[in-house]
């Protein structure tokens, strides 16, 4: 115990010589008393120890009384003193505390925490709070650890209230609080007495601490004595024994807790975070920082202190080492928490030091900036303030806080890299960062890692010295030898089903090669005239020639002649035509050879009475040798006796006319007269050129077995008969007949050229056989609803073709103008438009009619009738349709009106006369229906009588057909009501009149066409059904009204349709009727085709 007390006494003497006393302000003492509570184990040792300790403190305080003024001058805030790097004396704990807490090496580069908060007028950030706690904890931990090792009483020198200081280099230190003023004088006296007694040299001024630090140290010792030993407080100023003081100084630092310092540090940091915030607003912080604050401000437990009234004896000296180790555990926990807050704990020292350095630097630079603003712009601001009262108010508002806020914004932008002005920016070189693999390989090459050796089968494998190719070959050689390809046995191939595409391609590859057939050439004139005389034709060539036996007889000349003299109604006139029949047959044959080929008009067959058949047989028997002689001889007109005197050609096996008809009667008993060959009918086959390409084979009502070269018509004689009509009873003289035969028997090329040129460009295009054959066999089975839909689509398409410049399209779309005539304009007061039930067009009263549509389903409708191609001309879009051919001359006279922007169909509609618009009914370029032409009864030059034929003028027209139809109907109805004798006469006249009209061609042909026949009305089947219906109605008697009602129900309800749709329905109806006999016609064709080589 004696040696130990001597060591403590020596340490106390040395520390007392180094300590400095200073005055502390009044009012701080009461706050500092509870800051450092010491529970010394020697609290009950006596008053002597306390008195000695107090005397020791006074001596140190008095020694520093003279240096007070000098210290305050050097450091304005009381922190200037010995530097941090000053050497620590061995065993001197007070010197260590002064270096850490009270002394600053460079006060110009140091700012306090209060200065930072006042400069920015803003609280600290969370990162800055973490840095402050870490820097304080690290510094205090070093001081506490070194003080324990030195064994000095460092706890007594710690201040209760201290202030934080930041250096520009990132370091921190602290300054203590001031002492109470009433204790300054007494402590100075005690310090001077102690200095005189010990006579120790004073320390240099450069190493002295500040007045505040000395006062804090003296107050700390005095605080410890008065707080923990208050029952000896009256003995402070009395001298005590030195041995008791040594024992007291030895035991004090072992029992004082560090929690008071840590708690006060937490309060300072939290106050900085809550600086300048409203009272009702709490600072925002993370949960981790909040937990750290709770740990730093936790209350002390009973385990951290020792009760004063318990005498533990010698045991407390045995636990001295353990208490010293446990004193710094709180600091270690705080430092570790701050390190774990970062992603890289190893860089915590550098990071937190950089944060403190930035905070101090920004504050110092702000101060320099504000000082420059004050020095340079003070005069200007004063002058501006004096001149304008508004400026004074603005300057008053613009206080220090605004400048600080501006400075913070500038610093923040600079930290983020904002450019202050534009500069020539040059891109820095691209820095390529290595991949992790490259970094690992570089570290391996630099031998930063020590690789472990890998053992293979208990041994380290040797280095591979062979290349990859050699290793592959070695591996192949080590394997079993391969077999030859010829010795290998492969399994059966897997059966795979070919795809549809592969099957299609395979069928194409294996397809049969078709035999190449040269295109047929036009037969020469000799072969066309004599197809059966050429015995060198091949079988395939003969199949291409369609034989029609009706052309081998010229029975049609009888009806041609009767059409020229249709007004003759007596039997003498009829015999006159029979006598002159051979001469006209010769003329008809010449004209037939000179006319071009034309496709047949697709209307049904005709029913012929037996009288006409007998006349036709007789005529054919007389004309057969004449035709053979005329066609085989050179083309020149010979007298009739010479022609009959020529020897006939060599006899060949052939059928006579009677045998031929007898064969058909036996083979086709079930067919009616309409399905038999035309040589047994009274009417001629019609020739026409229509706009809708129909099927040649299916729409024929006669067997098309006649050679195509003879499918022409007697147009020359017909045009003559139409041009010069003879009065009844007048006959031609032989001279006139001879002149007529010589005139018509001219050069064939001239006649052919003349007849072809008269057809016009549109008609020529439809004489092409290939065009008719390709597009003639397309048929559909449609319903009435589908036809309505097709017509509506075609209406929209035709509407798109209207021009937009003349407002025609707009008026038609808004249903202001008639769709067909484009002339009648509708209004609210009238006239009103009528909507067609089929095409939904709005037409005027002149362009619509009411008709009955009895069927809801139509079979075998030709596609050409409902196709959009009917809207334009078949040849080209710039040529008019055949129904418009009559207006070609008038349209061409309009000049430039038919240019590209106005369709010709539109121009034809606009230029069409009103009477023609009433009678016209076409669908595109399809043939017009004759049903609407019977209302015009005022055509001049036509007279209809009940017993005499009508004489026509040279100008034919549509009204002629209507009048003849009306005359026929009148005659048929009146004949049923007359006596039998008179009825027979009228029936004979009606028969001749009907047969004369049956030879007429369709009225849809142009006027100048060779096949044009002006008195055409409809097909024979339609006339037959009309006549039979008329007779049935008159023969019904009393059941006439009932039959009429039943037929009205069968015929259907009348619906308003436009003229175009009515023509379409009529054409569809007639085409369907013609389709019914097409199968029988095919059978007849197949039966008669093989008779071509034997029939002449």
Curated annotation (Swiss-Prot):
CDD domains: FYVE_SPIR, WH2_DmSpire_r3-like, WH2_DmSpire_r4, WH2_Spire1_r2-like, WH2_Spire_1-2_r1. Pfam families: KIND. One of its GO terms (biological process) is Golgi vesicle transport. Phosphorylated by Jnk kinase (bsk). Residues 111-366 form the KIND domain. Binds to actin monomers via the WH2 domain. The Spir-box targets binding to intracellular membrane structures. This is Protein spire. It comes from Drosophila pseudoobscura pseudoobscura (Fruit fly).
């Amino acid at each position: 115990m004696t040696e130990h007390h001597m060591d403590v006494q020596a340490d106390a003497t040395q520390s007392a010589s180094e300590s400095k006393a200073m005055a502390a302000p009044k009012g701080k003492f009461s706050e500092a008393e509870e800051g450092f509570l010491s529970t010394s184990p020697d609290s009950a040792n006596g008053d002597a120890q306390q008195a000695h300790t107090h005397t020791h403190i006074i001596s140190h305080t008095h020694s520093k009384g003279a240096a007070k003024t000098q210290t305050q001058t050097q450091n304005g805030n009381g922190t200037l003193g010995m530097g941090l790097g000053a050497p620590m004396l061995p065993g001197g704990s007070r010197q260590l505390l002064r270096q850490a807490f009270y002394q600053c090496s460079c006060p110009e580069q140091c700012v306090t925490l209060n200065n930072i908060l006042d400069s920015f007028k803003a609280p600290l950030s969370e990162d800055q709070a973490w840095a402050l706690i870490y820097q304080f904890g690290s510094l205090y931990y070093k001081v506490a650890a070194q003080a324990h090792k030195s064994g000095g009483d460092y706890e007594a020198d710690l201040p209760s209230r201290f202030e934080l200081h930041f250096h520009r280099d990132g370091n921190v230190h602290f300054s203590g609080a001031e002492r109470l003023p009433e204790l300054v004088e007494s402590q100075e006296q005690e310090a001077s007495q102690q200095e005189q007694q010990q006579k120790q040299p004073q320390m240099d001024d450069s190493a002295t601490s500040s007045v505040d630090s000395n006062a804090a140290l003296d107050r700390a010792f005095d605080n410890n004595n008065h707080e923990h030993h208050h029952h000896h407080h009256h003995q402070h100023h009395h001298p005590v024994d030195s041995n008791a003081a040594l024992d007291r100084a030895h035991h004090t630092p072992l029992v004082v807790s560090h929690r008071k310092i840590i708690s006060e540090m937490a309060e300072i940091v939290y106050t900085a975070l809550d600086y300048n915030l409203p009272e009702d607003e709490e600072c925002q912080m993370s949960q981790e920082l909040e937990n750290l604050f709770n740990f730093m401000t936790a209350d002390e437990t009973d385990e951290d202190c020792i009760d004063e009234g318990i005498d533990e004896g010698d045991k407390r000296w045995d636990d001295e080492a353990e208490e010293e180790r446990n004193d710094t555990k709180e600091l270690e926990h705080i430092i570790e928490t701050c390190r774990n807050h970062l992603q890289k704990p190893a860089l915590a020292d550098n990071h937190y030091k950089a944060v403190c350095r930035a905070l101090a630097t920004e504050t110092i630079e702000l101060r320099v900036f504000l000082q420059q603003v004050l020095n340079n712009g003070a005069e200007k601001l004063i002058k501006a303030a004096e001149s304008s009262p508004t400026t004074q108010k603005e300057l008053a508002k613009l206080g220090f806080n605004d400048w600080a806020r501006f400075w913070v914004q500038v610093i923040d932008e600079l930290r983020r890299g904002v450019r202050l002005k534009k500069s020539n920016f040059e891109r820095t070189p691209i820095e390529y960062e290595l991949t992790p693999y490259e970094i690992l390989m570089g570290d391996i090459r630099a031998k930063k890692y020590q690789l472990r050796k890998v053992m293979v089968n208990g041994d380290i494998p040797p280095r591979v010295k062979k290349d990859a190719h050699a290793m592959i070959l070695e591996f192949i050689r080590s394997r079993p030898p391969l077999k030859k390809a010829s010795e290998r046995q492969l399994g059966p191939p897997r059966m795979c089903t070919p795809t549809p595409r592969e099957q299609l391609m395979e069928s194409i590859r294996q397809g049969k090669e078709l035999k190449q057939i040269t295109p047929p050439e036009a037969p020469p004139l000799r072969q066309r005239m004599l197809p059966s005389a050429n015995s060198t034709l091949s079988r395939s060539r003969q199949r291409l020639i369609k034989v029609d036996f009706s052309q081998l007889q010229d029975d049609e000349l009888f009806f041609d002649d009767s059409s020229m003299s249709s007004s003759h109604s007596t039997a003498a006139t009829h015999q006159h035509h029979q006598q002159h029949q051979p001469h006209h047959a010769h003329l008809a044959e010449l004209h037939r050879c000179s006319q071009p080929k034309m496709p047949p008009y697709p209307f049904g067959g005709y029913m012929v009475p037996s009288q006409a058949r007998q006349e036709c047989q007789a005529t054919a028997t007389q004309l057969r040798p004449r035709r053979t002689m005329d066609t085989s001889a050179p083309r020149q007109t010979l007298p009739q006796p010479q022609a009959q005197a020529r020897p006939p050609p060599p006899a060949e096996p052939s059928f006579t006319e009677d045998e031929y008809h007898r064969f058909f009667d036996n083979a086709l008993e079930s067919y009616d007269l309409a399905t038999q060959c035309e040589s047994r009918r009274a009417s001629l086959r019609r020739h026409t050129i229509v706009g809708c390409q129909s099927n040649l084979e299916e729409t024929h009502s006669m067997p098309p077995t006649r050679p195509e070269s003879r499918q022409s018509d007697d147009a020359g004689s017909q045009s003559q008969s139409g041009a010069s009509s003879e009065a009844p009873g007048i006959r031609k003289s032989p001279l006139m007949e001879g002149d007529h035969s010589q005139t018509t028997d001219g050069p064939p090329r001239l006649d052919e050229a003349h007849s072809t040129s008269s057809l016009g460009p549109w008609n020529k295009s439809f004489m092409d056989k290939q065009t008719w054959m390709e597009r003639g066999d397309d048929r559909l089975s449609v319903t009435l609803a589908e036809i309505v839909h097709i017509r509506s689509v075609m209406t929209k398409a035709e509407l798109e073709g209207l021009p937009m410049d003349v407002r025609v399209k707009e008026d038609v779309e808004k249903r202001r103008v008639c769709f067909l005539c484009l002339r009648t304009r509708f209004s609210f007061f009238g006239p009103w438009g009528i909507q067609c039930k089929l095409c939904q067009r709005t037409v005027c009263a002149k362009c619509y009619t009411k008709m009955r549509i009895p069927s809801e389903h139509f079979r075998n409708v030709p596609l050409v009738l409902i196709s959009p191609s009917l809207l334009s001309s078949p040849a080209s879009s710039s040529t008019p349709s055949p129904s418009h051919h009559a207006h070609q001359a008038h349209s061409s006279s309009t000049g430039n009106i038919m240019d590209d922007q106005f369709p010709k169909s539109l121009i034809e509609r606009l230029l069409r006369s009103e009477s023609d618009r009433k009678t016209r009914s076409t669908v595109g370029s399809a043939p017009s229906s004759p049903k609407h032409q019977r209302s015009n009864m005022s055509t001049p030059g036509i007279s209809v009588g009940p017993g005499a034929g009508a004489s026509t003028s040279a100008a034919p027209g549509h009204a002629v057909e209507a009048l003849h139809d009306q005359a026929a109907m009148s005659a048929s109805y009146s004949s049923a009501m007359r006596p039998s004798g008179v009825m027979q006469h009228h029936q004979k006249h009606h028969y001749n009149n009907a047969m004369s009209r049956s030879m007429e061609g369709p009225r849809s042909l142009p006027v100048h066409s060779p096949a044009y026949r002006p008195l055409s009305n409809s097909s024979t089947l339609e006339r037959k059904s009309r006549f039979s219906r008329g007779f049935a109605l008159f023969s019904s008697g009393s059941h006439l009204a009932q039959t009429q009602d039943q037929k009205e129900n069968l015929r259907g309800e009348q619906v308003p349709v436009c003229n175009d749709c009515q023509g379409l329905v009529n054409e569809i109806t007639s085409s369907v009727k013609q389709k019914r006999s097409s199968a029988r016609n095919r059978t007849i064709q197949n039966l008669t085709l093989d008779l071509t080589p034997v029939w002449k």
